[in-house]
């Protein structure tokens, strides 16, 4: 009986540990290369492995990006969308790239974006760089991730069209 109870408690603890939520503040700087214009925003990000991500913007207030399973919902610049990523390849790459980069699964993100991968570590900061092997209609031309103690602290997503978005995460 004690062994069964102990086993049940261990299984429950393992499930709870796997379902932990990570939450922090973030800043975002979106740079449009053609004009040099930089659009800044900030908010709170909440991630629960493996497929729950919420970015709630406090500036501009009311904007959000929510990933829940295969669904991706956002309100950006007054445009609301709701997409089933199982039926939309462009948004599936965006969804998977965000989830994999936040989770530290950069090998899969590189594979999804057909990118070469390099990883280095200096002074406790792991830097991951992914560079697309060729131009593509979807995905990212370059991705840079920085992690400290397994948590993402910086993410740069460069699109083929010349838009670069940098996120800084503050725990």
Predicted regions and their residues:
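N-terminal signal peptide c-region/cleavage motif recognized by signal peptidases
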Residues: 13-14
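Short, surface-exposed coil-to-beta transition loops
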Residues: 39-42, 60-61, 68, 138-142
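Positively charged n-region of N-terminal signal peptides that target proteins for export
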Residues: 1-4
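Flexible, processing/modification-adjacent segments and terminal tails
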Residues: 21-32, 37-38, 77-132
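Short hydrophobic/aromatic-rich beta-strand segments that constitute the beta-sheet cores
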Residues: 26, 53-57, 72-75, 128-130, ...
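Gly/Pro-enriched, hydrophobic low-complexity segments
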Residues: 119-171
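An acidic-aromatic
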Residues: 45-96, 165
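One face of beta-strands
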Residues: 22-26, 41-45, 53-55
């Amino acid at each position: 009986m004690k062994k069964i109870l102990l086993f049940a408690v261990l299984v429950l603890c393992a499930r709870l540990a796997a379902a932990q939520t990570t939450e922090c503040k973030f800043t975002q700087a979106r740079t449009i290369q053609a004009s040099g214009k930089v659009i800044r925003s900030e908010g709170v990000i909440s991630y629960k492995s493996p497929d729950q991500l919420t970015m709630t913007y406090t500036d501009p207030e009311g904007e959000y990006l929510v990933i829940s399973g295969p669904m991706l919902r956002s309100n950006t610049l007054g445009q609301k969308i709701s997409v089933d990523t199982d039926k939309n390849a462009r948004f599936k790459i965006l969804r998977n790239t965000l989830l994999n980069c936040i989770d530290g699964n950069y090998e899969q993100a590189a594979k999804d974006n057909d990118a070469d991968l390099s990883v280095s570590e200096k002074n406790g900061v792991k830097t991951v760089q992914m560079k697309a092997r060729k131009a593509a209609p979807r995905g990212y031309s370059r991705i840079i991730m920085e992690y400290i103690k397994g948590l993402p602290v910086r993410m740069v997503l460069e699109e083929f069209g010349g838009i670069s978005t940098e996120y800084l995460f503050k725990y």
